[in-house]
Amino acid sequence: MTADIIYIYSDGACKGNPGAGGWGALLVAGGHRKEISGGEPNTTNNRMEMTAVIRALELLKRPSTVEVHTDSQYVQKGVSEWLPGWKRRNWRTADGKPVKNQDLWQQLDALSQQHRIVWKWVRGHAGHPENERADVLANQGVLQARQY
């Protein structure tokens, strides 16, 4: 890992879909690590996956080079492939339907424009230590959400 790159490992979890959900992220830069997590009582897995990345990017104090590792193809493909078309079509899908989670996509889009980001999809639960940690944090968020 290079010290000038901020690595973000994110995950979302949902018990029921919709249901109680949690998100977690691990940020690694140089020798520093920061863990964040949270939850919502009634949400979806995709909203939690997106929230994990949003909350991590919100912590960055200045424009940075970032590598986001997510096991969510929805997030990775959404940002890398689908977002430009949605914006061109005024937040409509290719078949004219409103984009789901538009509020979060707009937040993620705005935050992404502040940084140089490489989006990397990783297979979930494949033994990658940082992504496994993000999964633990997301499940802690589910437990927090169930207490509401």
From Swiss-Prot:
User: Is DNA-binding included in the keywords of this UniProt record?
Assistant: no
Annotated localization:
Cytoplasm
The chemistry this enzyme catalyses reads: Endonucleolytic cleavage to 5'-phosphomonoester
A single GO molecular function, which one? nucleic acid binding
Alphabetically sorted, this entry's keywords are:
Cytoplasm, Endonuclease, Hydrolase, Magnesium, Metal-binding, Nuclease
At which positions is Mg(2+) 2 bound? D11, D135
One matching Pfam family is: RNase_H
PANTHER family noted in UniProt? RIBONUCLEASE H1
**Free-text function comment from the UniProt entry:** Endonuclease that specifically degrades the RNA of RNA-DNA hybrids.
- Please report the name of this protein according to its UniProt entry: Ribonuclease H
